Amino acid sequence: MRTATVQRTTKETDIAITVNLDGTGDYSVSTGIGFLDHMVEQLSRHSLIDISMQVKGDLHIDQHHTVEDSALALGEAVAKALGDKRGIARYGEAHAPMDETLTRCVLDISGRPHCVYKSSFSQPRLGEMDTEMFPHWFHSFAQTAGITLHIETLYGENNHHIAESMYKALARALRQAVEIDPRKGDAIPSTKGVL
């Protein structure tokens, strides 16, 4: 099984994350930010990646460190679970509708971290989560996961739907990309021979 555990402890956060890329979408998520929990749960359920995430952050200051560090640790766990990436599909893409909203996600498990984020919100908060933290979450996740990530909300009005469709699109694209392609055997999916 492709699993990994990451423990990240700083003066700002204490994080324990375990992922199973070959899971069924089981999750146990507690970040102290209810809306972020809901989004990571969507990511787990729709990617079929089991995620256990326990985060204690300095929320008495603000959400920045908790959101950033949890995304960094989750990306690191995914990268660690992928190992040398032998046999994976590597690429994934998905469109995720949520009522009036549609988001597209395209990604490459390339080893070259990059994020293009095109989405916006008409209000500063969703529940207790600052909407300005969403682009930061996606950039941080892409950085440590080692993926090239393009995420774009094509249209939408409801802020909750916009956020949720982004995480669901990422989930579906990630599910495709981490899958083992039996035709590849144990080959690394690159002409360079390394990712």
Curated annotation (Swiss-Prot):
Lineage: Bacteria, Pseudomonadati, Pseudomonadota, Alphaproteobacteria, Sphingomonadales
InterPro entries: IGPD_sf (IPR038494), ImidazoleglycerolP_deHydtase (IPR000807), ImidazoleglycerP_deHydtase_CS (IPR020565), Ribosomal_Su5_D2-typ_SF (IPR020568)
A cellular-component GO term for this protein: cytoplasm
SUPFAM superfamilies according to UniProt: Ribosomal protein S5 domain 2-like
Subcellular location: Cytoplasm
Catalytic activity: D-erythro-1-(imidazol-4-yl)glycerol 3-phosphate = 3-(imidazol-4-yl)-2-oxopropyl phosphate + H2O
Protein name: Imidazoleglycerol-phosphate dehydratase
One annotated GO molecular function: imidazoleglycerol-phosphate dehydratase activity
Enzyme Commission number, as recorded: 4.2.1.19
Family stated for the protein in its record: Belongs to the imidazoleglycerol-phosphate dehydratase family.
Pfam families: IGPD (PF00475)
One BP annotation, GO: L-histidine biosynthetic process
Associated pathway: Amino-acid biosynthesis; L-histidine biosynthesis; L-histidine from 5-phospho-alpha-D-ribose 1-diphosphate: step 6/9
PANTHER family xrefs: IMIDAZOLEGLYCEROL-PHOSPHATE DEHYDRATASE, IMIDAZOLEGLYCEROL-PHOSPHATE DEHYDRATASE HIS7
This protein's UniProt keywords: Amino-acid biosynthesis, Cytoplasm, Histidine biosynthesis, Lyase
Primary location group: cytoplasm
Disulfide bonds listed in the record: none
